[in-house]
Amino acid sequence: MDKLYSLQNGTDIRGVAYKDDKSDLEITLTREDVKNLVRGFATWIIDKDKKDHIKISIGTDSRLTGPDFRQACVEALTEIGVDVVDCGMATTPAMFMSTIIDGYKCDGAIMFTASHMPYVYNGLKMFTSQGCLEKSDLKDVIDICVAGNFVDGNSKGNLIEKDLIEDYAQILVDKIRAGVDSPENYEKPLAGMKIIVDAGNGAGGFFADKVLARLGADTQGSQFLNPDGMFSNHIPNPENKEAMASICQATLDNKGDLGIIFDTDVDRAAIVGSDGRPINKNALIALISSIILEEHPQTTIVTDSVTSNGLAKFIKARGGIHHRFKRGYKNVINEAIRLNEEGRESHLAIETSGHAAIKENYFLDDGAYLISKILVKAAKLYRESQDIGQLISDLDEALEDKEIRLKIEDKDFRSYANKLIKSLSEKIKDIDGWAEVADNYEGIRVDCYDEKGWFLMRSSLHEPLLVINFESDIESGCDMINEKLTALIK
């Protein structure tokens, strides 16, 4: 049972769950592990909420082991008296919503997913109505599993099957209709628009027919909507260059007004403009920031640490406050929540990875909700013969960017990285044309004036790696910065 600790990846459980002749990896997450983990989760809820009887919803993305793990979950939970709401194929954000929306209001929710990881992986994300379990909460669940202190049910729990995605999709449809509030065509505010969806064979295919088509959009030309746990076409990841190239080309080929791409479990997304240009990473943050700032002037936009100087300038020009924080979507979300609790208004927490959480939506990182928010604005602009990309026409984007990941051999890799960063901070003071950025919350960020760029050096969140991100506005600028930096840290 102790091995369960090694499966914890921040706020998630992840492991190798499937083996075939294409993979050399050994299975680390088994059916029995799943049973123990969900029993531990149920026990944790019962102990926390002081309830005798609870209800937990379960769902999966398109991964090959999803159905078997879902069945194992049903068996384990009903055996200890827990009622189970089987939502079938779902999305991670929808599973959270099952803890709060009428007709569900589950005490907990479990999503089987491993995000954009290769097909052999699977994992679990656990929710209550307060959101995804924190890292410390998940450890408490594993502690219960290791100790074997599971609750005993007096009677067998009930199994209820519900179409959560249908109900969740209707929430999005209603949101878009109300947001556009079209006097000409309230029911179908996207009529006339051509919108291409790429679900990457994950769980996001529903968005084309259950949301866009119902709103009048033409989605012909959409691709990889069918669930396929082998992810045969491309990795379902808005940060992946191949995936973005695929949706960009599909948008151009089909003369789309907009392209949309989701990751496997739909907690992340990105879009493509009618010109085929990707709107992800800094551009996506700029776009949704522009929309949020129209509704909430001067609000604080919390981002991760690797956002560009051009983005900071863009947000400031629109009257917003850019709070550049740490990597890790949970870090970014929790920071926005903290700022609000301190009286500093923040309506958006977003990572360059495409995780975006909006205050009005429970600070839930929800790719489909993010896209719905953008679609409301896009529909209004379409009626004025304008394109969504015009909102970020003045965003300064770097000529080049680069990321280097260096393996740290030292066993105490965090301590090693911290010492290296501290030493570098001292050396930077003697480098003409370089200046350490003062308001920085992760690693060290340095503006490089001669190279018209910057770099950020930090320790990886989960791996023994030193990660260095670069941007520059001149050709070969990233290499120039790296060459100078390498000489400093040798």
Task: Mark where each language-model region is.
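N-terminal small/polar loop signature for handling phosphorylated ligands or for N-terminal nucleophile
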Residues: 43, 55-121, 210-272
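Conserved phosphate/anionic-ligand binding catalytic regions in large, soluble enzymes, centered on
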Residues: 5-19, 199, 203, 348-352, ...
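Phosphate-binding and adjacent anionic-ligand microenvironments
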Residues: 297-490
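A short, gly/pro- and small-residue-rich
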Residues: 119-146, 272-288, 361-372
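Gly/Ser/Thr-enriched, mixed-charge loops and adjacent short helices
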Residues: 103, 120-254
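An N-terminal, well-structured beta->alpha segment
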Residues: 1-73, 79-80, 158-195
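Proline/glycine-rich low-complexity loops and linkers
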Residues: 78, 87-88, 92, 142-174, ...
